[in-house]
């Protein structure tokens, strides 16, 4: 259960048989203390043996309501590690398996795509790529938080280098929070990229999987790139990559720790200098791309 636009990446793709929207009206009753749970919701929940929740619920109101509604077992963790806790977010999520005694050996996320996802991606690229022999590079210049974004002028310089110096096809991924950055890129790099605009996550993942390289910020799309196995370069600044960094065998993270980094959400919200990300240069990224090309990684 969650937001359907996110959960599509697992529905019928190995991890989930069915999904349920979190933004249904009756769900809101779970967050009200001593709530009278609607019969429609109680009917759904009574047949559930176990719920593992990563919803913020510090007062345990939701947990209490779930148990009152008939759920046999509820395991709850806050959605993120406590601030200052030295644990990667993936290891935080895996705590529930430790509690249940479920063994696991691999801590690297992997996305499984449907054949139809791959076919859509192939058709998308065939319609837009004039030379399939050229290097395909996906770039995501956005993030859910502007302070986590590498400066847009550096993306401009990188995109122009990719298209003009190594003759690569550049695909720019645009999501709901990226409109401002995309409009600026359209002005500054003109027709030097192919826009991947507002597509469902399984399709975005399939397109990235077809590419030779991904470059992006600390964002969910970067984790997606790592999970499909595409070589990924990511720029971190205000957040700690040892906690939030994408995991993968082909991931390179650039992080230039500054005196104020990593910082709290409140500090980040009021920061307009982003000196932590200023320390990552275009030449850093170009050097890594040259290395990847040289060794065909």
Summary of predicted features, one role per range:
Residues 1-297:
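Catalytic machinery of carbohydrate-active enzymes
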